[in-house]
């Protein structure tokens, strides 16, 4: 073969190889990176790990349906260690890796520290659980979005349970001493006043997030003889189970009432029989209507069980829904840009989600009804809606 023909032949082979490679790239587009920052170690570590599993289960469902903008989702998970400085470091790390969205926020102090960092980077930030009202104040992130009930919403639901469910007059508070705990207690007391409920605060004990020994505090509460003791503790892996056990061991009189979203099956599993009798309020239960018969929720529950052998609790549903809302908005608007997606979610409505058909308030707060429950024989027994 002469040199000219050989050159054209090699060029043809190269072109064919390039075309073949381009075809492969078209079939396997680059994934869209989704960042997740939650506690994966320490007291809240088990719950953070479960939420991460739920997000991965939802990612699998979304990818099977075509992904986001025709591209698969790749979930990058980081441990914030329930520490603000670590959360900020993890946020910067994920931003550097080019994530399109960050799903974060178990602890309010950590979420509040991360918010301005993520906002300055121009990355969409969806807060899952951090319930401090400051999360949606606009100071750290003017385009904030949150799924879990706010302190105000949770406080109103707990106040309703105190006033109408238990008709408690003598109230004791066992409160986590941070933005979440203090804000939640203030919201509960504001809710009681809004209901014109006549009550007396007979005891108030505060503690740090990492505390697991509440015997001295509960001894003081026992001496106050409360009708209802409100436990406000976001450390569901360590602190809340300890409160349940020590409350029963200390023979504290009256009803133990947990703040919204702080008693899940994982908490009950750790606390054992001491969890029986505790009351609370929450926003999601996988096997209770209207969720039990919802086809979208059923698919999510089935996928979570298949992938991780775990039935989702409220924490897991919130994590999955955060990814779902983002994916729905991105596919609808055909963009990954932070501002249009945030404006679509804030004040917007979505059909066919894990939570059913839902809406967000203009400030970015997901609007969901709450349901009162008690724990009996190691299981959550839902009573009736406690408010919206």
Task: Place the predicted regions along the sequence by residue.
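N-terminal secretory signal peptides and thylakoid transit peptides that target proteins
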Residues: 1-15
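Extracytoplasmic "Venus flytrap"
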Residues: 31-54, 78-85, 106-107, 174-183, ...
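Beta-alpha junction/loop-to-helix N-cap segments that form part of ligand/metal-binding clefts
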Residues: 46-53, 61, 68-138, 207-214, ...
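Extracellular/periplasmic Venus flytrap/periplasmic-binding protein
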Residues: 88-89, 133-134, 142-251, 289-299, ...
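Periplasmic-binding protein-like
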Residues: 94-106, 126-128, 172-175, 225-236, ...
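Extracellular/periplasmic periplasmic-binding protein-like sensory domains
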Residues: 244-320, 379-387
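Segments of small-molecule ligand-sensing domains
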Residues: 303-317, 325-380
